[in-house]
Every structure is written in C-alpha cells, then in structure tokens.
Amino acid sequence: MNAQEIIEYIRTSEKKTPVKVYVWEKTPVTFPNCREFPAGEGCKIVFGDWKDVKPVLENNEFSHLEIENDCRNSAIPLLDMKDIPARIEPGAILREQVEIGKNAVIMMGAVINIGAIVGEGTMIDMGAVLGG
C-alpha cells in the first residue's frame, strides 16, 4: 500500500470499540448484533461493539458484570496471525494490512503498523517499530 492508500483505508474504515462482556443475568437478555456464548445457567459471554452492548447493559439489570476492552474507535484491527508462516512472539503488535514473509521472526514488543513489509527470513527485534 502506498501512503495515499493507507490514509484512505484508515479514513473510510468503520471505527469499532470491541468489548467482551461476562454477564450473570437476573432475567434472560438478548444482545442484538453481538455473539453470545452460554457459560452456565444465567451466565453468558458476549462479544460485540460497545455501541451495541452499552444500551443493553443500561436498560437491564444483572447480578454480576465484567467488561473487557482494549481500544476505542479503532480503525485498523490487529492482524489475524493464525496462518502467517512466521514466528511471532507474544507481545508483538501487528496491524492488518501488513506483509510478513515466510520464516520471518517478530520478537516480543515489536510493533508492525499498517503498510509495513517484513521480508522472508527477516528478524524484527524487541521494541522495533515499523510503519508503511
């Protein structure tokens, strides 16, 4: 991606605030536009965007509630690393729209931002920051 394509991608991306919510319901509740996973009687784990989850939480009562969230109005999600043919250590941060070459090594604490290209067999050391 060139600089203009990156700017346009960020500008037009839907901004999201993903949350994971653990709830113990007093009465059954549905979370529209969210993924719900039962976790026992009256308990569930909910994945969704804050704009969809917040109204449900405000308009219902729960016995217990815990919310996890790690970003706000984020334009670029993290890279799905499951099928990347490289070694990526815990704590490395890779955004979508990066290219990671075969057998590359990304050490913990490295940050690989949108548009960056890491060549085949390349090692990115701890604390390195690469951008496109």
Feature names for model-found ranges:
Residues 1-83:
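Terminal amphipathic alpha-helical/low-complexity segments used for targeting or macromolecular assembly
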Residues 82, 86-132:
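Structural signal for interior beta-strand "rungs" in well-ordered beta-sheet cores
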